[in-house]
Amino acid sequence: ELAVVQSAGAILQWDMETKMPPKGVELKSQQLAFLQKIAHQMLTSQEAGKVLDAIQKDSEYDSLDQVQKRNVYLARKAYDEATKLPEELVVDIVKQQTVGVNVWKKAKAVKDWKLFMPELVKIKELTEKKAELLMDIKGAKTPYDALIDDFEPKMTADNITRIFDGMRKGLTKVMDKVLEHQDVDTGFLTRPVPVPVQEKIGEQMADFILYDIKSENACGRIDTTEHPFTTGYYTDVRITTNYHENQFMSSIYSILHEGGHGLYEQGLPMKWMYQPIGSSASYGIHESMSRFIENM
């Protein structure tokens, strides 16, 4: 039931970004906040806590297989973290994110950053409250580490710095070699390509990578949005792109990139559907799948 509620929220977010009329933002924020409220109540219920306690204390716990133990671990992690967050804060974050995205679109359209700044500050303040509340249960040294764990479990800012410092040494050498060759004619990249033509190319690229949007058993679709993203769950995973007539490669790369995300989500084992383990491992893994398709 929790997975169903969360997947319903994902599709509502997709609607907000793709099909929602301008006047619908307030209603959409209420809808998303309500679903988040239900999900939070399900996660933090006394019954959920009692069930987890009973499972972990049961004499048969050690006989569970690896997948079963992983499910228990992930359920316990979600429960422990959710119980540290007040329902009001959880709801406020979702509402502000919804309003913030809408204002960001308007600010981007008129190229006025100041329009978005107040909403970004509100999101930042709410997120800081969340991070501070989660530090202890996550064993994080800093609020930022607590937030990183949401996206890349067990990762820290110190480890990221160490990894990036190591990568920089090799990448700098590669960039130096690239910069030695700047006499390449890239004029074709800005040649005007009508949007309908780009759409056909995008559909062909999706078909090439086996992201199905056409068959009677299709689990995907491609829509237009301000900023490309992927959302959905197992048999309904949707991607978006945007089109610029003078930058046709933008839509191609985004379809390949988001298609990679979509294929990863659709490729999760069906036997894990509705289980805690039946979700993406981390954002790092997710991005590796999307960049593999995009770059290869």
Task: Name the predicted role of every residue range.
Residues 9-16, 75-77, 180-181, 235, ...:
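Short acidic (Asp/Glu) and glycine-rich catalytic loops that position anionic groups and cofactors
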Residues 93-248:
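Contiguous, non-catalytic segments that form substrate-binding/exosite surfaces or channel walls
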Residues 28, 164, 195, 245-248, ...:
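Active-site-proximal structural scaffolding
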Residues 208-217, 262-271, 296:
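Secondary-structure transition/capping motifs at alpha-helix termini
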Residues 20, 274-279:
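Short beta-alpha connecting loops at secondary-structure transitions
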Residues 1-155:
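A well-structured
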Residues 135, 243, 250-270, 287-291:
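Active-site recognition of the HExxH zinc-binding catalytic motif
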Residues 279-296:
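Post-HExxH zinc-binding segment in Zn-dependent metallohydrolases
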